[in-house]
Design a protein with these regions (language model features):
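Canonical AAA+ ATPase core
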Residues: 2, 7-15, 23-115, 160-162
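C-terminal engagement/docking regions of AAA+ P-loop ATPases
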Residues: 133-215
Length: 215
């Protein structure tokens, strides 16, 4: 049910393409035989941003298939101490199942039932549209290509997840803002001017949200 694609940018393009096709179509074909993938089927891919030699960066269209891109920094001192404590105490024999596929599917159904009103759907559409045809001059020079409709769908789903985790049955504008960078940072293609000015994708996402009126 859960696949870890470690350092996916070290896999050749053909392997990347096969994985992303499986993510999209939920089945794989081997020797003319098609095998359905289990439900749920989730992929977590990692990239090492430091060492880029010998890597195969994912094309933008393939990156778009990933629901979110989460940045992982160094652990805090407390987190690192906990890593050291656990290092010699956890073995594969002590790892137990904590949730069943049925429970995951059940909770996914609950997330889909979270209410999001028409004004907030319009807000999501406006945010994503701002990445394509920016109203601010500053944004126009920094964005080469904006986000696709997949971004709107992902932002709606992710904001529902945030509301669910906060114990609410409805989405608020803050839910959308909170998860915005994770959903959009890999879907916006920056211009050379943005790179020259030292602007990150997160900087641009903040400008995008600042440019759109909250309903």
């Amino acid at each position: 049910n859960f696949l870890l694609a470690d350092e996916i940018n070290r896999a050749p393009a053909k392997v990347q393409s096969a994985l992303l096709q499986a993510m999209e179509e939920k089945h794989v074909t081997i020797g003319g035989t098609t095998f359905p993938l289990p439900s749920p089927f989730m992929v977590l891919a990692t990239e090492n941003p430091i060492e880029q030699e010998g890597t195969y960066p994912l094309p933008e269209a393939q990156l778009d298939r990933f629901f979110m891109k989460v940045l992982i920094d160094y652990p805090t001192a407390d987190e690192e101490r906990e890593i050291l404590r656990r290092f010699n105490t956890i073995s594969s024999d002590s790892i137990k199942q904590v949730i069943s596929p049925e429970h995951v599917r059940e909770r996914a159904g609950l997330v889909e039932s979270i209410y999001i009103n028409e004004k907030l759907l319009g807000y999501i559409v406006s945010v994503v549209a701002e990445t394509r045809k920016p109203s601010r001059k500053e944004l126009k020079k920094y964005i080469e290509y904006g986000a696709s409709p997949r971004a709107s769908i992902a932002l709606m789903k992710a904001s529902r997840c945030i509301a669910f985790m906060r114990g609410r049955g409805f989405v608020t504008p803050d839910d959308i803002k909170e998860i915005g960078a994770d959903v959009l940072r890999h879907r916006i293609i920056l211009s050379y001017e943005a790179e020259a000015d030292g602007k990150s994708a997160d900087d641009i996402v903040k400008l995008v949200f600042d440019s759109v009126e909250v309903p």
